[in-house]
Every structure is written in structure tokens, then in C-alpha cells.
Amino acid sequence: MIQPQTILQVADNSGARQLMCIRVLGGRKRYASIGDVIIAVVKDAIPNMPVKKSDVVRAVVVRTSKPVRRDTGMLIRFDDNAAVIVNQEGNPRGTRVFGPVARELRDRQFMKIISLAPEVL
């Protein structure tokens, strides 16, 4: 459950470390969950990388602390809120994804992120 002003960790090697959500895309949605696209600002970044501090970027939420209920009745919850920075077409800007990602990304057609992730839960 990500809303504006929420701080997220970055789960890729694009150069950003922390993001702050400033808008949830997709109509009049108040909260973003796993697989939703948000607009965020980079709050912390690694020097000499493509993504700089204070850049406004699009990102896909890949992990949330709020439990997500699946159709089978199982709840899945992660330790942190994390996102992967993507371009306008939905392809990741980094070349690696760190940490596990949720299977719900497959339903939202983010196959490139799924293929880069070391573990899909």
C-alpha cells in the first residue's frame, strides 16, 4: 500500500537508492500495490550513474510491507517497500534486479523484470 510521500528502496542497479512516491498512476487510485506504476522522485543516488538525485522517474512496485492476498487465500508480505525504475515502455532502466519479487508482476506483463529477478515468490 504505497501512497504519495512513501519512501521506497530501489531494487535495481540504475543508480538510485531511495525513491519517494509522488503520484500513483492509473485513474483515481489512492494507493499502489504490487505491480502498479508510480511516479517518484529520487531521494538518494550513487554518484556517476544514469539516474541522479532529484530526477523524476517512473517505477513499478515489486515488494510491499502490506500483505497482499492471492486467489488461493495465501497472504504474501515482504520486509520492505521496493520498486524497480522503468522507462515509458515499462522496461527496466537497470540491468539487474536485487531481492525477490512477487508473482503478481507476471499478471501485469512485466516479464523483463521477472526474468531479471533472482527469485519470484
From Swiss-Prot:
Query: Tell me, what's a Pfam family for it?
Result: Ribosomal_L14
GO biological process, alphabetically ordered: translation
Q: Where in the cell is it found?
A: Plastid, Chloroplast
List the record's Gene Ontology CC terms alphabetically: chloroplast; cytosolic large ribosomal subunit
Show the NCBIfam families listed in the entry: rplN_bact (TIGR01067)
Q: Which family does it belong to?
A: Belongs to the universal ribosomal protein uL14 family.
| Quaternary structure and interacting proteins, as annotated | Part of the 50S ribosomal subunit.
PANTHER family, from UniProt? 50S/60S RIBOSOMAL PROTEIN L14/L23, LARGE RIBOSOMAL SUBUNIT PROTEIN UL14M
Q: What does this protein do?
A: Binds to 23S rRNA.
For this entry, the protein name equals Large ribosomal subunit protein uL14c
